[in-house]
Amino acid sequence: MAVNDHVDMATSGADRTAERLAAVPGIRRAPTPKLQQFMLSGFLGADTCAALIAQIDRDVRPSTIADPNGDEAFRTSTTCDLDHRDPIVVAVNNRLHDLTGIPREYGEPMQGQRYDVGQEFKAHTDYFDPHGADWETYCAIPGQRSWTLMIYLNEPAAGGATRFLATGKMHQPEAGKLLAWNNVR
């Protein structure tokens, strides 16, 4: 079985996501053939960002990684599994699904990440290695993680950038900015 045999990319919408994103007014595509990556400023307004931050602050827990690598400092951030029943979370999820065209049943629960001064998530991928220890746990039923959608909720005084090693592109935090990239190559 091939890596994505259990996910019908033609019916999931994931194969058309780049085309849909490219048609969104104001969206910018990274000028590289190495990665399908898009950025949209102002995706969320200040009130929505503040409401999500309040939920994250209330329900935060230490972040984890799917496939432990023995490096305790690999990911030092905190995480919140946002309540999928919350009206604000529902509205944001609906906007994300409308934007990408990927049906909701192929999406993962929304999480919020918090990075305090000095915290980080070292270089990693958002897709799962089919030969890794985490493949059966995370991909046997739902399939490979095809697209990642990330929204910055605030602008720290310093730090907070997301760097893509494959392209050399670094994105600075800007409240409400959406980053979307394809993990399947």
Please state what every model-predicted region is.
Residues M1-A180, V184-R185:
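Fe(II)/2-oxoglutarate oxygenase catalytic core
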